[in-house]
């Protein structure tokens, strides 16, 4: 008889993030705007639609390039980065999964806010990591307390979102640049900027 791993057996049988489609089926109505899924209310641009239509008969039936070479290089060029600074994934959930698998092993401590993005927690638990939560302060993720918790516990990873979902609050770029200097050398800071386009430019840190 096939049995699950010890880590999987410890996981609760819940869904970390209920998608909008499931919520629509449950409610019996369709959301007019799905900001919680970070979707544009304007839809794709006409240029994007034409480009997708043009490629249907050419390449869409093939396996995609596993290195995403052209896409990574185009993004790197537009963002003034090296292509090695760009990774392509299945949305934020896929990218978080890659990150966790790179860094977290059973028993590794991870710092996050109590009430932050649940799918991040799902990936950490699935890898056997130990989550340490820091409460929000005045509806904001408490950055100073996140750093203190990491220093005290010996955590290898800190996660927070800026702007934050679901609270909608945001920290200034200056504040984030200040706390980066306080992070332990053996700890990685993961900033989820999925909603960066909803905030003023001065709230997005210029991190080299």
List the model feature ranges, each with a label.
Residues 2-3, 7-93, 98:
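N-terminal small-domain helix-loop-helix segment of the aminotransferase-like
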Residues 35, 189-190:
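Residue-level marker for buried hydrophobic side chains located in beta-strands
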Residues 60-184, 190, 195-208:
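Conserved core of the PLP fold type I
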């Amino acid at each position: 008889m096939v049995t699950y791993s010890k880590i999987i057996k410890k996981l609760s049988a819940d869904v970390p993030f209920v998608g909008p489609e499931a919520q629509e089926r449950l409610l019996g109505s369709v959301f007019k705007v799905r900001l919680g899924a970070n979707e544009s209310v304007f839809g794709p641009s006409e240029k994007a639609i034409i480009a997708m239509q043009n490629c249907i008969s050419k390449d869409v039936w093939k396996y995609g390039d596993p290195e995403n070479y052209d896409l990574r290089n185009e993004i790197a060029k537009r963002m003034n980065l090296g292509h090695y600074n760009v990774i392509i994934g299945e949305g934020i959930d896929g990218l978080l999964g890659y990150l966790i698998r790179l860094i977290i092993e059973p028993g590794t401590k991870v710092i996050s806010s109590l009430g932050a993005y649940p799918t991040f927690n799902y990936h950490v638990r699935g890898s056997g990591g130990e989550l340490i939560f820091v409460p929000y302060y005045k509806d904001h993720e408490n950055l100073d307390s996140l750093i203190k918790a990491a220093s005290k516990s010996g955590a290898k990873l800190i996660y927070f979102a800026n702007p934050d979902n679901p609270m909608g609050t945001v920290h200034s770029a200056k504040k984030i640049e200040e706390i980066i200097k306080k992070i332990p050398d053996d700890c990685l800071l993961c900033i989820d900027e999925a909603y960066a386009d909803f905030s003023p430019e001065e709230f997005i840190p210029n991190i080299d």
